[in-house]
Amino acid sequence: MTNVAVVYHSGYGHTQAIAEAVAAGAEGVGGARVSLIPVGEAEVREAELDDADAIIFGSPTYMGGVSADFAKFKDWTSRKWLARAWHDKLAAGFTVSASWGGDKQNTIYQLLTLAQQLGMVWVGLGLAPGNNHSKGSSDDLNRTGASVGVMAQANADQGNEGIGASEFRTAQALGKRVAEAALRWQSVPLAQAA
């Protein structure tokens, strides 16, 4: 059994919808148990984060970076940094912005940097870029062409119907990949690996 936590902030519901898709992808892996944790609940659900073998971080991209609520959570994790409590856990990340570009890469790098500060091991998306040739379309998996994590696009003037179906499939693929990696990561105890 492996425990995967998806911890996220969502301002308008788009990031929550992607978080739920990430969680669904992880839940589809036999032997994976998933916790979906809004950042506002992180402190009261701290044990679930500490027990997780992998933590997937998610934030909307606001003004080229993580949201203020996610930044507050990020600062809260300094206690984990000090204790090295999340050292060697797997990590991954996702973000959503209204624009196709939206400087989402900066947000993903903030999530990656957080994981590295905490001594975690980052799992990238692992998908080829979609929608980057004449026969491609916005229905392609990984339509934004990300590699470090999911960088989804959602129309600002719509609810979850403004998120393309391929974004949900891409998010599910990330959840699946992280859960599978966590199972492999656990499969050989360190004493045997040495």
Predicted features along the sequence, with ranges:
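Short, glycine-/small-residue-rich phosphate/pyrophosphate-handling segment
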Residues: L90-N142
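Gly/Ser/Thr-rich helix-start
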Residues: Y12-H14, S59, G65-V66, G93, ...
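Short, flexible coil/turn micro-motifs enriched in small/turn-prone residues
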Residues: Y8, D53-I55, S59, S97, ...
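N-terminal beta1-alpha1-beta2 submodule of the flavodoxin-like/Rossmannoid cofactor-binding fold
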Residues: M1-W86, K135, V148, D157-A194
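Short glycine/proline-rich, acidic loop/turn segments that cap or connect secondary-structure elements
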Residues: S137-A154
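Short, local alpha-helical segments
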Residues: F94-V96, A154-N160
